[in-house]
Regions:
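Selective transmembrane-helix segments that form parts of the transport pathway or gating/packing helices
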Residues: 169-177, 213-214, 245-272, 508
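Long, hydrophobic alpha-helical segments
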Residues: 206-228, 263, 267
Length: 655
């Protein structure tokens, strides 16, 4: 039996890729403009002869003029907004802060403008100028990078990669962390023995141990490699040969990645054997699956102060992931609308519908340690009740009057497009299933042909028990395109690819920082970024000011004063003023560096394996191909930064 898996953010989808590329260009463009400004200051401060030796005269001239043009385009919206206001074309009483597109969506560093409200018709044009400036900055940075990449030769990179591979094997850090795996062998003593929990426990433990051991090992190897070579001056044997500086970076990255990939494959095989031997046969039969779900959109309706509200009730919990509906009220319901269904649903005798909800109890006694009763109503695109609650009640009455043989109910579902199940027991946070008659999907091909606006399937859930509340979320109910015939073993290896993504990310970060920083500083900065990615959701809430109780300094004041998070503070006190101002500065900085932090949750697929959901390779949401695109999009700017840092580094330095 599976528990309920919470999916906080929307899945990665191919149809969102164009918008993601647009936002990526704006975000990277903001950093590119900032980098060009820093480079220009460096170019002015240093004598021309020094700059020529480091980056070359032609590159310096190109970047200088590109920086000036990017800054000119980027600042033009501010000038236009000021001119627009000074000419009296705006209402001075209506002024609101409007951010550039990338800062508005992604909080990356550039500028904020004050634009008159009446200047809204010109706003899109001003955003276009910001977008143009960011794209130009990216092009300016990429031109020298592309020229440098054209000189690379794979034979030299491969030779450096093999050298890095051999050096890493000889280092003690690899074997020291491998020895910690002995502790991992005793983890089964502390894992749950109930069959329904075993697979989740074993998969979670092995994934956690493998990921953190390999990540720490890889970060140490990559962070100290180039600084150690520079300190020992062994890098001179490489740079004196016809080798590009960037080839050293790529060789290190490729060599360490190959080594950690080999270790990951071995550990994944051993972990799979460990899971297979440790799990009892009952758990294997029940949980060794790789199901393919089909999700719908959720619409919750409740009654608040005698009126119908298009949202659920709050039960006072800190998490807002789920909305709640009351039992015994016909107008309180949760509706899942499936706007597209796979063609292979047609022709099936039955189709599994799985669900797992939260139960909030308002009374104790006979309801404790028991489930609640729910009513499930299924309506296809031909059913008029899908858009009219009165028709739904009428059809429900006809349906239950026709109740008798199971085939009669299936015939009713085929003719009327309506099927209802009452008295379905729902257990708190446990995944259960009911079978939906395939007659509801017989005309699916006709629906696709007609391109009807009506959804092919609507599922309505109501709680029948009084004095109880049912918590629902979008991903709590789904149809199964495949009930789990996909191999669990294949899914386990696909889940390990998520750990490989983590390794690629941290190796490139460490190598990039090590091109200009000492070994220990490179490792600290790399781990700070990585740990920020682990807690990126919390960091995002802090940066947006959505955390309860204020920022870090305000929270410290509340703890020291023994004040809860909802009580107002005395803002006239000097300590409170200082804390609030410190939080404003911290939030300002966090907003500007937020896009530097990787969203590691996007690469973690442990829950999918543990909860028995298939990890798609290419065409579905959250596929490995989509995650690979996301990884490349994050690593590419860091690779460009490593290119410039390595070219500007004085190799003779012993620091």
């Amino acid at each position: 039996m599976f528990a309920v898996m919470e999916i906080e953010g929307d899945p990665l989808s191919w149809y969102k890729l164009p918008g993601a590329v647009h936002e990526w260009l704006e975000a990277v463009g903001g950093f590119a403009i900032l980098g060009l400004i820093i480079w220009l200051i460096f170019y002015i401060v240093n004598p021309p002869s020094t700059s020529q030796r480091k980056v070359g005269l032609s590159t310096g001239a190109w970047l200088t003029w590109s920086t000036l043009l990017a800054v000119l385009i980027g600042l033009s919206p501010i000038a236009l907004a000021i001119i627009w206001d000074s000419l009296g074309l705006s209402d001075a009483t209506e002024v609101r802060s409007t951010r550039a597109s990338w800062t508005r969506h992604l909080n990356v560093p550039f500028v904020s403008t004050v634009m008159p409200a009446s200047a809204a018709p010109k706003k899109d044009f001003l955003y276009f100028l910001y977008y143009l400036a960011s794209c130009w900055a990216i092009a300016a940075v990429l031109v020298p990078f592309i020229v440098g990449v054209s000189r690379l030769r794979f034979r030299r990179i491969w030779g450096l990669a093999k050298l890095s591979f051999k050096e890493a094997i000889r280092r003690r850090v690899l074997w020291a962390f491998s020895a910690l795996l002995l502790v991992f062998l005793f983890a089964s003593w502390y894992l749950p023995h109930k069959p329904e929990d075993q697979v989740r426990g074993y998969v979670g433990v092995v994934s956690f141990v493998i990921q953190w051991l390999l990540v720490i090992t890889a970060s140490l190897l990559a962070s100290f490699s180039i600084p150690t070579d520079m300190k020992n001056q062994t890098i001179h044997t490489v740079v004196t040969k016809p080798v590009e500086r960037f080839e050293i970076v790529l060789g290190r990255f490729l060599g360490f990645t190959m080594l950690m990939t080999l270790v990951l494959v071995v550990m994944t095989v051993l972990s799979l054997i460990y899971v297979a031997r440790g799990v009892v046969p009952e758990a294997k039969e029940e949980s060794f699956k790789a199901r393919i779900p089909v999700y719908g959109d959720l619409k919750v309706q409740s009654i608040k102060e005698g009126r119908v509200a298009e949202h659920g009730k709050s039960v006072g919990r800190e998490s807002t992931y789920r909305e709640y509906i009351s039992g015994g009220v016909a107008d309180e319901k949760a509706t899942w609308i499936f706007r597209d269904l796979p063609s292979n649903f047609a022709g099936r005798a039955t189709l599994p519908c799985e669900f797992g909800f939260d139960i909030f109890r308002t009374s104790k006694g006979k309801f404790e340690n028991k489930g609640v009763q729910c009513k499930f109503t299924f309506m296809n695109w031909k059913c008029p009740a899908a858009a009219d609650s009165r028709e739904e009640a009428k059809l429900a009455q006809e349906f239950h009057q026709a109740a008798g043989a199971e085939q009669a109910l299936h015939d009713f579902a085929r003719d009327k497009g309506f099927y209802e199940i009452r008295g379905v027991e729902v257990v708190d946070y446990h995944t259960l299933a009911i079978n939906v008659p395939g007659e509801l999907f017989q005309d699916l091909a006709e629906w696709k042909k007609q391109k009807s606006d009506a959804p092919p399937l609507t599922v309505v859930v109501r709680l029948e028990d009084l004095s109880q509340l049912l918590g629902v979320a979008k991903y709590d109910l789904y149809l199964l395109e495949d009930p789990g015939e996909e191999s669990f073993w294949q899914n386990f290896f696909k889940g390990a690819v998520g750990t490989w993504f983590h390794l690629c990310l941290i190796i490139l970060l460490a190598v990039t920082f090590s091109t200009y920083l000492s070994g220990i500083i490179s490792w600290v900065v790399t781990m700070v970024l990585y740990l920020g990615g682990v807690f990126v959701a919390f960091v995002r809430d802090v940066a947006s000011g959505q955390t309860s109780g204020g920022g870090p300094m305000e929270a410290f004041v509340r703890i020291s004063q023994g004040t809860n998070i909802v009580s107002p503070l005395d803002e006239t006190a000097a300590s409170v003023k200082l804390a609030l101002e410190a939080d404003r500065v911290m939030i300002f900085v966090l907003r500007r560096i937020l896009n530097l932090i990787p969203d590691l949750a996007r690469f973690d697929m442990t829950d999918y394996v543990a909860q028995g959901f298939n990890i798609s390779l290419f065409f579905r949401d959250n596929s490995l191909a989509l995650r690979t695109v996301l990884l490349i999009a994050y690593l590419l700017p860091w690779a460009v930064l490593a290119f410039y840092l390595m070219r500007s580094r004085e190799v003779a330095s012993s620091s």
